[in-house]
């Protein structure tokens, strides 16, 4: 399956159902009156973390996700049915961004609210009072939340395998786990992160084979920053370095890899790390190993020839890797953010655009919410709309801008002549 770790989508939660204007008129019923029911809630959109997924490919073709609308209210005070919620599976490690701000980090196999459905509108039964026993007032359902989101996947792995291209990372992953990565004798065989579950005794951990890094990866060279971000999720790092092949310099390779990690995120160097010195069966190995130990005496090194490793060697490697995940190692810092707490501050409740031909266009989130919520289907609703608009100062502002009788005013889809 194609690996996709970044997509942009639009989510539109369901609209709430409209409340209705209705009166009870039945023979032999002496207590009639308003009985218009409320609209149902619009359906919300949830993302659900799924450990069985490892790509955002399903979103690559589905750019828009729509929630189900709530049903309108009915007579006899009946509330409309709620719109069905939508639950969409996403890979663990998916981050959700709104206008470049992280709003949700999906790290657990549970549901996360992404877009909330709109509240259902009230029917005229709710507007009865001692002064108005037969109100012709109702509300439309609110629109569901509508967001343009960027989804970014950072694989959830305990240990990341890093190294230069063709160093043996894929071979190692195939030996210690059930993963079957592509293995070949040329550079950049691995073009996307490969995950494998490593079992050791009664425990297990997840290892990620990350595409080979070259000098300048942090600034975009090679696979570059596209895959460096996946290392941020790891709790430990294993360097796989070729110590035996001709024209290889393990010291230079190790320094370059650490430099790229540091440039990308300095915190990566705080993670527990070991080096697997690969190709110990080749002539240059001992010479390179001795030089490396002199340069980095504190670095833990495991000698191996991965291509011909015996089972006991593989078990030792697994034990050493598992040891990196001890209690003293740094814990991954993860922040879960509740999207329902996001608020948008309006600079102004409305914006007026005027033209020389006596045309005024009104826009703005607050005025849009008012015009959307109050249906102009009765005299009482029109009066209610007029009172709310007057309260926010729209009429006064139009007068200041020189509006004249007969001028046309448009508020989204609603138009009227000024009188």
UniProtKB/Swiss-Prot annotation:
Name of this protein: GTPase Obg
Q: Where does Mg(2+) bind?
A: 170, 190
User: Any idea of its EC number?
Assistant: 3.6.5.-
Q: Output the CDD domains linked to this UniProt entry.
A: Obg (cd01898)
Can you name the source organism? Mesomycoplasma hyopneumoniae (strain J / ATCC 25934 / NCTC 10110)
What quaternary structure, including any partners, is listed in this protein's UniProt entry? Monomer.
Q: Per the record, what is one GO cellular component?
A: cytoplasm
Keywords assigned by UniProt, alphabetized: Cytoplasm, GTP-binding, Hydrolase, Magnesium, Metal-binding, Nucleotide-binding
* InterPro entries linked: G_OBG (IPR031167), GTP-bd (IPR006073), GTP-bd_Obg/CgtA (IPR014100), GTP-bd_prot_GTP1/OBG_C_sf (IPR036346), GTP1-OBG_CS (IPR006074), GTP1_OBG_dom (IPR006169), GTP1_OBG_dom_sf (IPR036726), OBG_GTPase (IPR045086)
